[in-house]
Curated annotation (Swiss-Prot):
SUPFAM superfamilies: TPR-like. The keyword Cell wall biogenesis/degradation does not apply. InterPro entries: PSI_Ycf3_assembly (IPR022818), TPR-like_helical_dom_sf (IPR011990), TPR_rpt (IPR019734), Ycf3/AcsC/BcsC/TPR_MFPF (IPR051685). It comes from the Eukaryota. This is Photosystem I assembly protein Ycf3. TPR repeats lie at residues 35-68, 72-105, 120-153. One of its GO terms (biological process) is photosynthesis.
Length: 173
């Protein structure tokens, strides 16, 4: 059963109905429409915290989707689920796969930086300063890339880069 038939969320239902209308109007192959349908259902399940169902839908969308740009967003969303479940290594794998297909995906760059920063904090708490420094430097590199692509976003990251001396204020853009 399509998710919109069992979903009580008004905004999600509205998105689903609009997506169905767009799919009917735009020229797309049956496979492209099916891939988008799975992607849409994955987003719906993910927004409700139904991560196993979301992953099933995303994997099916990934199997069907041929467009690299669209595949990058599917991979990105899979990475989001793994990150939210604390599976950071898997999340990094999917974020990197998304970036391989679409290097202009600031949220993926930001999320990679967040994971490295988190690993740096954990290493610092364990007094492993060398690993902490390495992780913080990796986080800085990914945040710099994200900021270059979306200079008005990631304000906290920009402040962290400045306060830690990892980026001079004049080199942000």
């Amino acid at each position: 059963m399509p998710r919109f038939q069992k979903n009580d969320n008004f905004i999600d239902k509205t998105f689903t109905v609009l997506a169905d209308i767009v799919l009917k109007v735009l020229p797309a192959s049956k496979q492209e429409k099916e891939a988008f349908s799975y992607y849409r259902d994955g987003m719906s399940a993910q927004s409700e915290g139904e991560y196993a169902e979301a992953l099933e839908n995303y994997y099916e969308a990934l199997r069907l989707e041929e467009d690299p740009y669209d595949r990058s967003y599917i991979l990105y969303n899979i990475g989001l689920i793994y990150a939210s479940n604390g599976e950071y290594i898997k999340a990094l794998e999917y974020y990197h796969q998304a970036l391989d297909l679409n290097s202009r995906l600031p949220p993926a760059l930001n999320n990679i930086a967040v994971i490295y920063h988190y690993q740096g904090v954990k290493a610092s708490e364990k007094k492993d300063l060398e690993t902490a420094r390495t992780m913080f430097d990796k986080a800085a590199e990914y945040w710099k890339q994200a900021i270059r692509l979306a200079p008005n976003n990631y304000i906290e990251a920009q402040n962290w880069l400045k306060t830690t001396g990892r980026m001079a204020s004049e080199s942000l853009y």
